Amino acid sequence: QYVLNDINLLSWMGFFSMGCILIGVLLVPLTVKCFGKKQVYLAGMVLWAVGDILNYFWGSNSFTFVMFSCIAFFGTAFVNSLNWALVPDTVDYGEWKTGIRAEGSVYTGYTFFRKISAALAGFLPGIMLTQIGYVPNIAQSDATLQGLRQLIFIWPCALAIIAALTMGFFYTLNEKRFALIIEEINQRKNKEIETEEKTASVTL
């Protein structure tokens, strides 16, 4: 509305963004099967960052803005779809590491931090808009428009890159390792059952 002076663009953005998100969500099972959760998650982050950075530098008209935004929304579809899919993996990893299956604690912690992030997402933009001098329903200054573009594109892009780097370097739970972890957990459970059966037979 303020950057491109095209109020009708909002309706087109809603249509195309939902379409790209829907296509991305439908492709998640196939891409995960072919490449694994981690790689698909990273690819989604990269697409998100690329779409935002392209929009910041070259999204100067309605067509390029929608096109680059679709790239970003397509990437977020993979990221948002896999957020919940990665949680059960951490539950199994925790059980393998500690011997305790803390499923309730993991999901509770994840839900808690999602609520914290949602609260911050509603609180921080208001402060940042005030800092750049944004006043709704009036013509914005060049400095304010530049600040809006940074808020919309640069900050999300930077956070997506940080998340991708963190995931790439510190998250080592790929499909091959996860399969070995599940196998070891099952072996432990089988041994526990055998031990219990032997103990019961001796008692009898």
Task: Give each language-model segment a name.
Residues 1-204:
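Membrane-embedded alpha-helical bundles of multi-pass transporters/translocases
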